[in-house]
Amino acid sequence: ERRSWTAALCCCMGWALTAAPAGAAPASLTLDVPDLGEPVGIAADLSEGRYWVTDGTTSGRTTVVSVGDDGKLGTKLNWQAPTTDVQALSWYDEHLYVGDIGDSARRRDHIQVLSPMSLNGGSASWMAWDFSYPDGPHDAAAMAVSPRGNMYFITRGDKPAIYRTRSNPSRTGVNALIKVADAPAGVTDATFLADGSRIAMRTDNAIHVVDAYSWHTIGAANFTDGGGEAMTTDLRQANLELTTSATKVTTAQIPSKVEKIAAVPTASSDHTASQKPTAATEPDSSRSTSKRPVGTVAAIIGAVVLAVVAGVFVGLWGRREDA
């Protein structure tokens, strides 16, 4: 009987060791979409288990495609909305949001966000909202929608900052945005994480995670795996998916501690070493009850500890049996 208990314990130990890597980031994704340029926006569709992608080229400005978790083309969505510079996609409450927010010349008196009313493919009607910055035109490439439905825009260029919409924006007029914090330089995309209280932001060389209440940086990690601009969560919201070329999407873990970010060797003021966001006014006040994902490292450490304890236990049990 004692040998049976020992065998069972060893089996549990073996299961823990083999199960631990399951928390690791899944394999990278290859986008198999003909004529797709380098994506500027990607959003995880948590309802249907797919990703929406747009490349921001002339044709891409009126086309968004979906791909499965195998990278294969699914739905091609067209709509007739006039746009200026589509730069971002976001997903919230079973709706896709398209950020027409680019303004490299800083000449637009307002930006717009579109939301197709159907995601079944083909042509679609859309909803649209117009927004203006309180301090003049800005170029932006990043948009994220909070669990409360507030839209956040992260500008780039001189004095990069984070702005958000007021609750229930009008669809018949131009809505004034609120500046909530300074932002890291050169942000190209952003997404809310599963708990709804953190925003992940991507730059040319790093991933930053900020608390959406205090606007303090709570995680930062270097990321230099190729080029690319777009970022979203994976379909489990446990990791991040970052585009690194027209066809490649690389998985990265969500930073949980602040690393020193290496400076990008460029003369552009948009892409200098990142700065920490600083709080301004009115952070989003909604907090999701979703559980935060457990990291791979924690799973491995737990398995190792279990293995050590099991080894000691088996050794002591064996000694008792021999005595």
Predicted regions and their residues:
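N-terminal secretory signal peptides that target proteins for export/translocation
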Residues: E1-R2
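Bacterial N-terminal signal peptides
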Residues: A7-T18
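Sequence/structural signature of beta-propeller domains
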Residues: G23-A323
